[in-house]
Amino acid sequence: MANNGNANGNVWQFKGNTATSDAAAVALRKLVFKMFRNYNFNSGKPILAPSPGEPSASPSFLTCPVAEEAVAAAARSGMANSYAPSPGILKARRAVADYLNGELPAKLTEEDVYITGGCNQAIEIVIDSLAGNPLANILLPRPGYPHYDARAVYSCLEIRKYDLLPQKDWEIDLDGLEAAADENTVAMVLINPNNPCGNVYSYDHLNKVAEMARKLGIVVISDEVYKHVVYGDRPFIPMGIFASIAPVITLGSISKGWLVPGWRIGWMAMNDPNSILKSAGVIQAIEDCLDLTPQPSLILQEALPDILEKTPKEFFDKKMKAMRHSVELSYERLKDIPCLFCPKKPESCSYLWVKLDTSMLVNIKNDFEFCMKLVSEESVLLIPGVALGAHNWVRISIGTDASVLDEIFDRIKTFYDRHAIRTLPKSLGLYLYCNDQEMET
């Protein structure tokens, strides 16, 4: 019989932190791993898992040789073997400031930039820095990127949602945003270019967002990791342009633009020309949080200036040409699957954000069930919309080779054909109805 006491016969004093379970429950990685476990290893079909959003796994989406050589040179230099300062090394911070300044009226210096272990660490630090008030809440988009939800839950920051409007090209519902805020709201998160919807916000709309943030007295956290994944007609506008209206914390990384999510190097930039963040103690809180967290790889920090400054335009042009081809192919193939509908062709990112009509399917009640059965029966892993805050939507990653995309949509079509509700011909339906009536009498 197990002895649950310690050596003195007393009860052990420790137990697991349930806050981690609560936060992980809304984390995207946990859902992806859960879906992987539903894969049928006896199916004979290799799993096609495009939905984690990693085009870097595809031969058509390889990073730039300039970036690879910069990392190799940094590793060989002997200058990247020590610890880095908590905010990041000056040359990396200066390079990020210069990289962002080309589009900003109020120029950044290296003192305004902090280097992080990818954008996810930047999210964690910013949210932790704003969570001092136990009554504080944060406004997050619906649909949105679930790492914000997970970190807010972990930091005991109340989450309030505002909607993105599909009928208005996924613009922010500003009236709904204002209604969700109160005197304890500290920030709103803006994702532009948008994951998962694939839209790019206009100058006028971003200006209205800044005016609303000023009215509410909140900081805008602007997630701009997809700024180099824009292939539509609308240009990307950085939120920092409007920092004179309301303070903006810009989050970015090289993960998506350079196709290297595994390198884990990103940044936070304080667009604060009126020193509002500094006066409120937010800058100090961010620096304190950085002192408590591991520093990003010094090799990547040493390489960052060359990556940002020397990557040729041709690299981005080639990548965007490949993405446009993937979008067109996927958008057309989707038309063969009646239960899935994409309301707007994406202009950015590497996803189709697709509405699911479960009324056309047998024994599938919602998006989660659709995705779980799809991976079990056809070995295709998609992300259910519920993971991103939207019921009966599905996110399909399209950043892969054309042959793989064709196979993905072939399998989804097979799945649809298997589960589609069959409509009986009128003559047969009438015959069955009359036959049933005769049996009842």
Regions found by a protein language model. Give the residues of each.
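PLP-dependent enzyme catalytic core of the Aspartate aminotransferase-like
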Residues: D98, G102, N363-I364, E369-L382, ...
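N-terminal small-domain helix-loop-helix segment of the aminotransferase-like
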Residues: N8-G118, I125, G176, Q295, ...
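Helix C-cap/helix->beta junction micro-motif
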Residues: S155, K215-L216, A246, E378, ...
